[in-house]
Regions:
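Elongated, mostly alpha-helical coiled-coil "stalk/stator" tethers of large membrane protein machines
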Residues: 1-108
Length: 108
């Protein structure tokens, strides 16, 4: 499967769950923070792809990256992605989630 397809499926699943729980705006803020973190901190990608860095350490990095308190749904999602060894897809998932949210809310 290609990166776009996999990333899109994860982003759509997260958006659907967040919407069902009424947390799509909160998750949007967290995903925006994640996307911004990847843009501002290029080393973040390297740390995520480093097999020496443990999953709990990667979760800490991704939840503390933007300096804001993240919601539980975001943290659970990050754990799921890392458990399936899809951390390299996180930037793409974040951008797709942001696009889905903006499309839904008619934000240009």
């Amino acid at each position: 499967m290609d990166i776009g397809t996999i990333s899109s499926r994860y982003a759509k699943a997260l958006f659907s769950l967040a919407k069902d729980k009424g947390q799509e705006s909160r998750v949007y803020d967290d995903m925006k923070m994640l996307a911004d973190s990847f843009s501002m901190e290029p080393e973040l990608r390297g740390a995520l792809s480093n097999p020496i860095v443990s999953v709990p350490e990667k979760v800490k990095l991704l939840t503390a990256a933007g300096g804001i308190e993240v919601c539980e749904l975001y943290t659970r999602f990050i754990n799921l992605v890392l458990a399936h060894k899809r951390e390299t897809l996180l930037p793409f998932i974040a951008y797709i989630y942001i696009h889905l949210y903006r499309k839904e809310k008619k934000i240009t």
